[in-house]
């Protein structure tokens, strides 16, 4: 993940300074898509394993999140 982000930043700096070749532009787009998918997957995983509890110990997790958590458990 760090390598992908490093290369994205490297290409971005080069784009601002001198521009990118067609191959570099394609690489940049592919890396950005890969990074975005990985980031979203990590965030989804975190959210789907989250339970929100108020001060009284009651589960106040939003209904939409609870539904998604149930669907995930059913699909496993």
UniProtKB/Swiss-Prot annotation:
GO terms for cellular component: cytoplasm
The organism's place on the tree of life at top rank: Bacteria
Chief location of this protein within or outside the cell: cytoplasm
Entry keyword set: Cytoplasm
Keyword presence, Ligase: no
Pfam family for this entry, one: DUF896
Signal peptide location: none
InterPro entries referenced in this protein's UniProt entry, alphabetically: DUF896
Keyword Cytoplasm among UniProt keywords: yes
Compartment(s) where it occurs, according to its Swiss-Prot or TrEMBL record: Cytoplasm
NCBIfam families: PRK01631.1 (NF002452)
Membership in a protein family: Belongs to the UPF0291 family.
Annotated protein name in UniProt: UPF0291 protein BCE33L1708
Organism: Bacillus cereus (strain ZK / E33L)
Lineage: Bacteria, Bacillati, Bacillota, Bacilli, Bacillales
């Amino acid at each position: 993940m760090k390598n992908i982000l490093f290369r994205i930043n490297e290409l971005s700096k080069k784009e601002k300074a001198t521009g990118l070749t067609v191959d570099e532009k394609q690489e940049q787009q592919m890396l950005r898509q890969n990074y975005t998918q990985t980031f979203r997957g990590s965030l989804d995983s975190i959210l789907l394993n989250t339970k929100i509890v108020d001060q009284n110990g009651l589960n106040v997790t939003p209904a939409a999140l609870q539904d998604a958590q149930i669907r995930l458990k059913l699909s496993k």
